[in-house]
């Protein structure tokens, strides 16, 4: 039997997860930039497809961000199957955040010894989506970075 507190935590988790999936799913196929740096992801993917290097000395044509290239290679692999646009980058970010939520659940559950605390940690992380600027589903390296930091 669930206590009132545990029921409230579970309901909160499912509400926050549903809101995240609803919002991220609605923004996944939006054909334009949701944020000013999202367009740079497409520029990086174009450079990958053309076989041009990322990390060169800054010029007027190209000044690279100091981001790890792994995200762009993953997006490029997805881009091969999905097609051009923001979908591949946003999909990588959404999957990364969902994997982070699952990792948070596992870490806190194992550390505290109770499932409900893992659910609470996952719910609190999902609750930060809007207050943190709704960046978790953008075609940017940040979500994959958060996943790898949590995994470490």
Where in the sequence are the language-model features?
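Extracytosolic helix-loop segments that constitute the early lumenal/periplasmic catalytic or substrate-binding loops
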Residues: 22, 39-63, 70
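Helix-to-loop transition at the C-terminal end of transmembrane segments
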Residues: 19-39
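Transmembrane-helix signature of polytopic, membrane-embedded enzymes
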Residues: 102-127, 146
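Transmembrane-helix motifs of polytopic, lipid-linked glycan transferases
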Residues: 91-112, 151
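Juxtamembrane segments of multi-pass membrane glycosylation machinery
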Residues: 50-52, 70-95
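Short acidic/glycine- and proline-prone juxtamembrane loop motifs at membrane-interface regions
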Residues: 134-142
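Specific aromatic-rich, kink-prone transmembrane helix
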Residues: 124, 131, 144-152
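Start-transfer (signal-anchor) and selected internal transmembrane alpha helices
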Residues: 1-24, 109-110, 115-116
């Amino acid at each position: 039997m669930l206590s009132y507190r545990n029921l409230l935590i579970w309901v909160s988790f499912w509400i926050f997860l549903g809101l995240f999936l609803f919002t991220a799913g609605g923004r996944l196929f939006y054909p334009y930039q949701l944020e000013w740096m999202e367009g740079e992801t497409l520029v990086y993917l174009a450079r990958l497809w053309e076989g041009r290097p990322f990390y060169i000395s800054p010029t007027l044509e190209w000044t690279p961000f100091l981001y790890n290239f792994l995200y762009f290679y993953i997006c490029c692999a997805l881009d091969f199957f999905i097609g051009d646009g923001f979908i591949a980058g946003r999909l990588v970010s959404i999957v990364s955040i969902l994997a982070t939520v699952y990792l948070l659940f596992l870490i806190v559950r194992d550390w505290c010894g109770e499932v409900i605390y893992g659910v609470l940690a996952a719910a609190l992380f999902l609750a930060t989506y809007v207050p943190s600027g709704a960046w978790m589903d953008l075609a940017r390296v940040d979500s994959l970075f958060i996943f790898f930091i949590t995994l470490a």
